[in-house]
């Protein structure tokens, strides 16, 4: 289950999601898999190796951690129990003028709890998110961004169990402005970069 906001949903042709590039990599690998989620975008994706792109996902543009926390139980029940959840840009759309940073971390932990409650053997991969365009990186932004990059590692370590592996993946190192279609969303190069991580 690809879970998150607009970087998961994509909005072709304006900007890309990593899902199509990841899907092609998985098809090439020969791994049997099925993307899950209650969302399904209508963008045009070319067939690959004679197969049609699996469009299912759980990405919603603009959604914040409180909204994901509120919706996750219903989405999991509707879409089916995932074996693997790819949790993109946790906290990325949270406005810290209306929610505390500690509440964002509580939401991320609660989202992981909800996934583990429905599948105690789930593998949960939490992004250390790729940064936005350099000109968007104010000192205030960087203070929060750098902190959450570290805090999701702590969350993953604490939330891992003997049956449910929670891990992080570094999407930030090596990511450049040339991989963005606008201030925050991926272009094709950015989508490929994220998919290969």
Regions found by a protein language model. Give the residues of each.
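Loop/turn elements at helix/coil->beta-strand transitions in domains of secreted/extracellular proteins
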Residues: 29-34, 80-86, 118-125, 161-167
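Short hydrophobic segments within beta-strands
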Residues: 3-4, 36, 127
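Extracytoplasmic/secreted cell-surface and envelope-processing proteins
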Residues: 10-12, 93-102, 132-142, 176-181
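Conserved SGNH/GDSL esterase-like catalytic core that processes O-acyl groups on lipids
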Residues: 7-106
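Histidine-centered active-site loop/cap adjacent to the catalytic His
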Residues: 1-3, 182-197
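Substrate-gating cap/lid alpha-helix
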Residues: 129-170, 188-192
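Stable alpha-helical elements in mature extracytoplasmic
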Residues: 14, 18, 68, 72, ...
């Amino acid at each position: 289950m690809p879970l998150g906001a607009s970087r998961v949903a994509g909005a072709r042709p304006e900007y890309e999601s990593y899902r199509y590039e990841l899907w092609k990599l998985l098809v090439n690998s020969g791994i049997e898999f099925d993307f899950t989620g209650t969302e399904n975008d209508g963008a045009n994706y070319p067939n690959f190796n004679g197969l049609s792109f699996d469009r299912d996902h759980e990405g919603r543009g603009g959604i914040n951690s409180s909204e994901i926390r509120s919706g996750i139980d219903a989405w999991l029940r509707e879409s089916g129990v995932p074996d693997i959840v790819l949790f993109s840009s946790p906290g990325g759309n949270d406005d810290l003028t209306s929610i505390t940073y500690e509440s964002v971390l509580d939401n991320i932990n609660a989202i992981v709890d909800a996934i583990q409650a429905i599948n105690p053997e789930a593998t949960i991969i939490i992004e250390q998110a790729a940064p936005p365009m350099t000109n968007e990186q104010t000192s205030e932004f960087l203070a929060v961004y750098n902190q959450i990059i570290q805090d999701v590692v702590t969350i993953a370590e604490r939330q891992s169990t003997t049956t449910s592996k929670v891990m992080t993946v570094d999407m930030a190192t090596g990511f450049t402005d040339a991989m963005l279609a606008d201030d925050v969303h991926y272009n094709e190069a950015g989508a490929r970069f994220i998919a290969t991580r």
